[in-house]
């Protein structure tokens, strides 16, 4: 198995990946479905239902967290399932998740202009035609296509640009949500809660009502899986990536629960019934009642529109990276692995998915509802396969470094498989309430046939290269397993070492390097004194992040300065020596007049 240096730029911060995951999960549902949730389970019953659903997804999220930190490569599910199940399992898993992403992107393109009609009823102008009972208007079509083009353009311009857009919109969503919650506390009344805390007139019917909410909630948490798709672009310690993924799920559960409580506190059962019979936007009407102003309902709808765009943006990021990873493994045409020369984004994959989102509104909203339901089925199938991969890899690769290592993996893995398998079953079993209708099965079947065609054609075209996988090298320190000593522990051990230090003589060697390299052992704080015999200007060589974040680099640099030795930094070392450009470092040393090298870390 080969290794290569990542072609992506590491531009995503911890905040970026948090808002990408959270924004993907918080779409339009909290605006349009809250009344239905309360009607099914009652206010507190719906909150408990979301908590149960969150726990179901939480176990799946734990498997993702461990695998993403262990294999931080573009494609996420593609890499996990490849290592566990081989190329065929990887193809099925990744192709399924791509269906989920593409369908969501296309659906959001239609959802946005539809919501504008709630704010401006006269928005629809220029009737064109009708598809499956849905009327297509020129104004509706124009807005959908223009926004689809804009979001695709933003993503092509760079991952960081897309993350910035995500941050702005997520802050707006959070702000609107906080306004509703605070206003409901001020303007609401506990008497509104009393008659609608729970649905059902007995313990058994109440529990059944709560579970009716719980079984539908996992579908509102789809989106946290976007994080592993862009793992190569994340500039965050690997262990923290897993933590952020879990945090995003917790925040989504909390957001939904607080919105339900806010609506229930300010709206009586009769208010909710009237709202559902009218606009159907119970949350927006709750906002208007809390502020005693109809304008505030439109403010909340704007927040819902931001939720549509954050989901859209996140799934476009995820879908394009998943396609890139399949093309990288010769499973689909190689053209989809092309990166933009300047922005380092998978440009051809973005062109395709973005193009589909621009064309999607032509087919109307009803047809895209069928597609997105089929896509959700694909996401749940991928979740189940990733959960299985988690268990398989604990047996198959126990020695794999796992920066974020889940405890009690057997329990977590089995529960994750059961939970995700349950979600898949809900789409398959007739009468479950979420089962696919014939049109949706046709969509899923068509996607499966397209996948089979790609599989056969690429297998014949690329032959033995089909399904090949290339690992991406990462920094040594970043992949340290949980059981290993931490970098800080190692540094402490060095600082408390014996005072007697053996300095080994310099070793000269020929590697086309115009400098001498000295290897020596000693305490960090004595680096300057140890370096004195070998030169007057040092090149400090280290990896990308760990030495600087731990403070080791600062200690070495200060020691050199105290000893009167100038120094410059070369921090482009990767884990795999074959991917580290030695000549680049040598040229840098020569250009800066360095006559000694101080290397920090094993990779250096």
Name each model-derived stretch:
Residues 1-12, 390-411, 431-500:
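Terminal cytosolic tails of multi-pass membrane transporters
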Residues 3-8, 47, 123-139, 168-298:
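Helix-loop-helix junctions that connect adjacent transmembrane segments
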Residues 9, 33-134, 248-251, 443-449:
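Extracellular loop-to-transmembrane helix junctions
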Residues 36-42, 46, 110-111, 124-136, ...:
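Transmembrane helix-loop boundary segments of multi-pass membrane transporters
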Residues 64, 73, 96-114, 221, ...:
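Membrane-helix boundary/coupling elements in multi-pass transport proteins
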Residues 79-81, 86, 118-123, 129, ...:
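TM-loop-TM module centered on a large, flexible mid-protein loop between adjacent transmembrane helices
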Residues 139-190, 245-250, 372-385, 411-415, ...:
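Membrane-interface loop-to-helix entry segments
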Residues 551-604:
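N-terminal small/polar loop signature for handling phosphorylated ligands or for N-terminal nucleophile
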């Amino acid at each position: 198995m080969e290794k290569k240096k990542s072609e992506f730029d590491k531009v995503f911060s911890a905040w970026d990946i948090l808002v990408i995951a959270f924004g993907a999960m918080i779409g339009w549902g909290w605006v349009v479905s809250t009344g239905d949730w309360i009607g099914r389970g009652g206010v507190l019953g719906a909150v408990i239902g979301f908590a149960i659903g969150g726990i179901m997804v939480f176990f799946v999220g734990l498997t993702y967290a461990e695998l993403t930190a262990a294999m931080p490569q573009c494609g996420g599910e593609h890499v996990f399932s490849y290592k566990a199940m081989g190329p065929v399992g990887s193809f099925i898993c990744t192709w399924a998740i791509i269906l989920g992403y593409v369908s969501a992107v296309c659906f959001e393109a239609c959802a946005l202009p539809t919501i504008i009609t709630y704010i401006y009823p006269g928005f629809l102008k220029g009737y064109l035609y009708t598809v499956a009972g849905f009327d297509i208007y020129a104004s509706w079509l124009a807005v959908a296509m223009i926004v689809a083009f804009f979001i695709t353009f933003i993503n092509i311009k760079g991952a960081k640009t897309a993350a910035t857009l995500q941050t702005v919109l997520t802050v707006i969503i959070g702000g609107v949500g906080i306004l509703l919650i605070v206003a409901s506390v001020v303007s609401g009344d506990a008497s509104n809660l009393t008659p609608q805390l729970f649905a059902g007139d007995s313990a058994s019917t109440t529990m059944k009502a709560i579970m009716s909410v719980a079984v539908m909630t996992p579908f509102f948490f789809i989106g946290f899986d976007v994080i592993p798709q862009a793992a190569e672009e994340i500039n965050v310690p690997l262990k923290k990536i897993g933590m952020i993924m879990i945090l995003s799920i917790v925040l989504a559960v909390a957001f939904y629960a607080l919105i339900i409580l806010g609506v229930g506190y300010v709206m009586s059962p009769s208010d909710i019934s009237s709202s559902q019979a009218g606009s159907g936007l119970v949350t927006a009407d709750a906002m208007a009642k809390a502020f005693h102003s109809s304008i505030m309902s439109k403010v909340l709808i704007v927040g819902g529109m931001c939720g549509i765009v954050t989901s859209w943006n996140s799934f476009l990021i995820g879908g394009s990276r998943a396609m890139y990873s399949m093309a990288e493994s010769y499973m689909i045409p190689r053209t989809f692995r092309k990166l933009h020369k300047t922005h380092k984004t998978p440009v051809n994959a973005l062109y395709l998915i973005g193009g589909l989102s621009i064309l999607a509104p032509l087919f109307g909203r009803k047809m895209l509802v069928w597609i997105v339901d089929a896509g959700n089925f694909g996401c749940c199938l991928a979740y189940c396969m990733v959960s299985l991969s988690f268990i398989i890899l604990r047996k198959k690769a126990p020695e794999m470094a796992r920066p974020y290592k889940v405890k009690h993996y057997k329990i977590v893995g089995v529960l994750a498989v059961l939970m995700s398998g349950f979600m898949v079953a809900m789409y398959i079993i007739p009468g479950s309430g979420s089962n696919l209708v014939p049109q949706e099965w046709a969509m899923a079947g068509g996607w499966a046939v397209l996948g089979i065609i790609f599989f056969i054609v690429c297998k014949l075209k690329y032959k033995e290269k089909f399904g090949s996988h290339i690992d991406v090298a990462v920094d040594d320190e970043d992949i340290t397993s949980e059981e290993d000593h931490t970098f800080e522990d190692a540094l402490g051990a060095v600082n408390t070492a014996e005072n007697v230090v053996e300095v080994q003589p310099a070793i000269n060697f020929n590697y086309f390097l115009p400098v001498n390299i000295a290897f020596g052992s000693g305490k960090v704080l004595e680096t300057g004194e140890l370096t004195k015999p070998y030169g007057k200007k040092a090149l400090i060589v280290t990896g990308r992040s760990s030495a600087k974040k731990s403070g080791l680099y600062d200690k070495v640099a200060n020691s050199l300065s105290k000893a009167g030795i100038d120094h410059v930094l070369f921090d482009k070392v990767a884990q795999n020596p074959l991917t580290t450009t030695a000549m680049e470092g040598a040229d840098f040393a020569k250009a800066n007049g360095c006559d000694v090298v101080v290397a920090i870390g094993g990779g250096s």
